[in-house]
Amino acid sequence: MKIYKVGGAVRDNLLGLPFKDSDWVVVGATVEAMLAQKYMQVGRDFPVFLHPETKEEYALARTERKSGKGYTGFVVHASPDVTLEEDLKRRDLTINAIAESDSGELVDPYHGQADLKARVLRHVSPAFAEDPLRVLRVARFAARFADLGFTVAPETLELMKQMTQAGELEHLVPERVWQEIHNALCTNTPQVFIQVLRACGALAVILPEIDPAIHTLMALEQAALATNNPVVRFAALVHDISAEAVVKMTERLRIPNEYSELGHMVCLQHTRCHSADRHAADDLFLTLELTDALRRPERFELFLRTCEADAHGRLGLEHEPYPQAALLRQALAAARQVNIKVLVQEHKDPQTLAPAIRQARISAIAALKA
């Protein structure tokens, strides 16, 4: 039995990047041998075990053979006779197909170290085409490592185009698609994810609602520069499509409510935010009402950040002041300072109370502009 560290931990260590967990491959072992050493089996489709102390994942060396559509259509063969080189060959990219022995020796049969130095994302073998999820993974890696200078190898991009044209991506389940999108939104340069998907034709399949125009990509880039919050970044991505399209997209991909709610709101109300500095007090308060700012101030702040990213997402305007956000923050603060208890005492009739509260809040906002 031989154990090797594999995958992202090896790659990131070679790049000088921090990494949290390590994955391991075990060569020459059986399920029985792993269980005898107190490893806990967790893999349903292939033998994966948790280390009894570290809880890191240890997988038996295996090969995979395509047996159906999508990313789940594989027959897995795991046995003591599967070599390390065979296991590494089934992996997606050369930079992810490097193993490290317990003595620190690197096993690199597919020249991953050379591609790390060249900053190239290159597929290991033609078997890459058997898993359509890899199209999204490569786009995500391109986004994650773009600031290090990584690009997709031309032959890999061509293979991704062929996979897209063959209809392979249509077999992906919504949850996995969203997981890759979400992970891409959490990278430093999420706009690169969209650019790569567009380049291979996958964007029209995965996110047909998105228009990958320069402004959309710049707004997403500005959102990423302004905040690590993936909800804001998602809203920046969808801000210029119709509200109906956002609903359709979020339902299709089963996107969490916090993303769909902010995206929908930004689509409907971002133009009101942009013109806030020209609004009278009653119109400013209407913006607060339409965005439910009084009840959900935290989400309103995300709305303002998205609108600011949109405003900065144009050539020459990246660093321009955006006073509209500050004005609306001040308007919200003023509206929240209104003493509701006093108004309740003054208006015993419930039918007059709500209008009185509304007018008091408008007056408080008007005082800001006086």
Which residues does each predicted region cover?
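Catalytic cores of the polymerase beta-like nucleotidyltransferase superfamily
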Residues: 1-370
